[in-house]
Amino acid sequence: MSHIGSKQIKIPKNVSIDLSMNKIYVRGDLGKLELPLNNINIHLKNIENDQFLILDPINTGTKKQKTASYIMWGTYRTLIENMLIGVSKGYSKTIELVGVGYKAQLIDKKLVLKIGFSIEINYEIPSDIKVDCSRSNIIVISGIDKQKVNQVAAEIRLLRKPEPYKGKGIRYLGEVIRLKEGKKK
């Protein structure tokens, strides 16, 4: 069994947490997030001017409910930790466009991509995500919700996945594409 759920989470100084019914609300300098909780108890603990969150699975109810609470214990801990980091520091993901004539522009709240198709592709950016195109072949996606930032990055990457022969396409910064060898005569 994994012990991720039993580790305590340190709360940063600039973050406030509200626990109500079956939800946790996290507020910080960059914004606020909420998460519905099922079959999990949360306790706040003070140790030497630092606040910690401790998660416990609910041990009452049917065997099925107990099992479900133990299964989700580590997941909830990680989600809450991601929320705390998101509202205090934020998350960002960088994408690069590799190919001749591949360009990206930000027009209003749309990302306009020229990626080798006969038409330009318009990608609608969600309201809580920030996109920066300071260079025409680099896209920086940032926000406070880790899941949304990575989801937007994955959706943009899927528009033109890197192909295995020349490596052209949209890829994450630092991603290594293993190239295949072409036909030999």
Swiss-Prot record:
| Subcellular location(s) per record | Mitochondrion
In terms of Pfam families, this protein maps to: Ribosomal_L6
Cite a single GO MF annotation: rRNA binding
Say where the protein is mainly found: mitochondrion
Report TM segments: none
Q: Which PROSITE patterns match?
A: RIBOSOMAL_L6_1
Q: Which residues form a coiled coil?
A: none
| One GO CC term, this protein | mitochondrial large ribosomal subunit
Which GO biological process annotations does it have?
A: translation
Q: Which domain of life is it from?
A: Eukaryota
Q: Which family does it belong to?
A: Belongs to the universal ribosomal protein uL6 family.
Protein name, UniProt field: Large ribosomal subunit protein uL6m
